[in-house]
Amino acid sequence: MWTARRILKDLADGDHRRKILTAFWRFGDEQMKAVAIVQLARAMHFRDETIRKMAPEKKAELLAGRVGSPEFEQTFENALMLYHTHEQSEMLGAFLDQWGVPHKNGSIEVDDYTPPAVDAVREAVRKLDAYDRRDVAIYLAAAGLLMTGAWRDATWPVVDELAPALRPA
């Protein structure tokens, strides 16, 4: 099972983890960020205001230090979503085009579409080999996590195939 914490620990290297968690602080809504600030302050015995004043990159670094903490799972899920929709929309669009899923800049904006089957996911990974394999694995794991159901059934087996070669050092 690919949780947000597992994706960040097992698939993302330090650079990807930093980019993903920085995206949370740059693109997240104020309520999401406020919850994360309170959680970080509590976990680190800091005042909320101390964390609030930090640069997004520093707050991302603090979050990265909590990647094993279950109480941050929702924050990490939001970070993955924000990273992909803001920083990886071109790659999302390329995969969605391969699967015939209507989208706008990588964001699915309709309810009436058929999620890809596992063979279609494998074929898209093969065809779109110009994209970094780590980026692809993180995307597919996050898609299965965030979209659930048929998406999970189609993407996670492919992530399981890609993951052994991507374990961070």
What are these regions (language model features)?
Residues A163-A169:
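Short, charged, intrinsically disordered terminal tails
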Residues W2, R6-L11, M54, V101, ...:
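Short, aromatic- and cysteine-enriched interfacial helices/patches
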Residues M1-V35:
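Charged, amphipathic alpha-helical stretches
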Residues A23-D153:
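Acidic, low-complexity, intrinsically disordered interaction modules
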